[in-house]
């Protein structure tokens, strides 16, 4: 079978399934004659490069039809990043807004928080900087009790938290922000996300996979880093999401 024919058949197969592996498509195409797996792997790679397919895990593909998650950043958030970056240019950090989580929720909860995550050694310094320079109330490592008793999540404020090493990040307008995979794991683990845990978490993860491209390999690698890999796998299996 010519390469164009193989590629056409791959895309046809991809349109009938939400996700698939090399073995899946190899078994399907081999019904009309044996196809070399190396050739098939090469064609899959080319389709990924051409952005006709997405690789959403190790050896797991899907038709390119869902957007990537790109959190929006307000001018205020950009200014906060600039303040921190100018003061500590070598400090690794990540910044985003809680309002970006609302699209994933089933039961909407107000969240006007600006999250500033920095390397563990810099948390205190950045907290002190923002306490002095920002007009917003700034909290360091907030937990459930602090939020429940003292913080109105519907009002703008800043949470300063440690950034987990090797956390998956992306650049939004040259500003480091979390990937969707990072957020889905952090929601499970961080005490300030207590209100999104439990049954709501299932809705969030299900909506994330429905609305956006999610790299399950990246998700599970970070989940392992945070000690919640098995729990994440169990959730994916409960939602009938393919695990690589």
Describe the residue ranges of each PLM region.
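Positively charged, polyanion-binding regions of nucleic-acid-associated proteins
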Residues: 2-16
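Residue-level marker of regulatory loop/turn positions in helix-turn-helix DNA-binding domains and
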Residues: 3, 36, 176
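Short beta-edge/loop segments at beta->alpha junctions of small alpha/beta modules
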Residues: 13-90
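Short, charged/polar micro-motifs that form catalytic or ligand-binding hotspots
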Residues: 15, 116, 170, 174
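Short, well-structured alpha-helical interface segments that form or flank functional binding sites
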Residues: 20, 39-42, 121, 125, ...
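Short gly/ser-rich loop at a beta-strand->alpha-helix junction or flexible surface loop bordering the NTP-binding
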Residues: 59, 75-154
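Hydrophobic alpha-helical interaction segments
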Residues: 135-244
């Amino acid at each position: 079978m010519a390469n164009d024919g193989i590629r056409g058949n791959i895309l046809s197969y991809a349109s009938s399934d939400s996700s698939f592996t090399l073995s899946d498509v190899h078994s399907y195409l081999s019904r009309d004659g044996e196809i070399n797996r190396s050739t098939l792997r090469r064609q899959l790679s080319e389709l990924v490069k051409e952005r006709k397919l997405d690789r959403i895990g190790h050896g797991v593909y899907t038709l390119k039809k869902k957007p990537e998650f790109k959190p929006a950043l307000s001018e205020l958030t950009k200014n906060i990043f600039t303040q921190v970056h100018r003061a500590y240019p070598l400090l690794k950090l990540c910044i985003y807004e809680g309002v970006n989580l609302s699209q994933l929720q089933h039961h909407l909860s107000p969240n006007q928080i600006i999250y500033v995550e920095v390397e563990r050694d810099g948390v205190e310094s950045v907290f002190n900087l923002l306490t002095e320079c920002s007009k917003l109330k700034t909290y360091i490592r907030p937990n459930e009790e602090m939020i429940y008793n003292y913080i109105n999540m519907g009002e703008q404020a800043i949470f300063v938290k440690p950034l987990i090493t090797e956390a998956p990040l992306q650049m939004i307008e040259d500003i480091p922000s979390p990937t969707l995979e990072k957020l889905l794991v952090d929601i499970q683990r961080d005490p300030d996300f207590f209100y999104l845990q439990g049954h709501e978490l299932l809705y969030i993860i299900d909506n994330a996979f429905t609305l956006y491209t999610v790299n399950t390999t990246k998700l599970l690698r970070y989940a392992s880093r945070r000690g919640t890999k098995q729990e994440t796998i169990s959730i994916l299996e409960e939602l009938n999401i393919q695990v690589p």
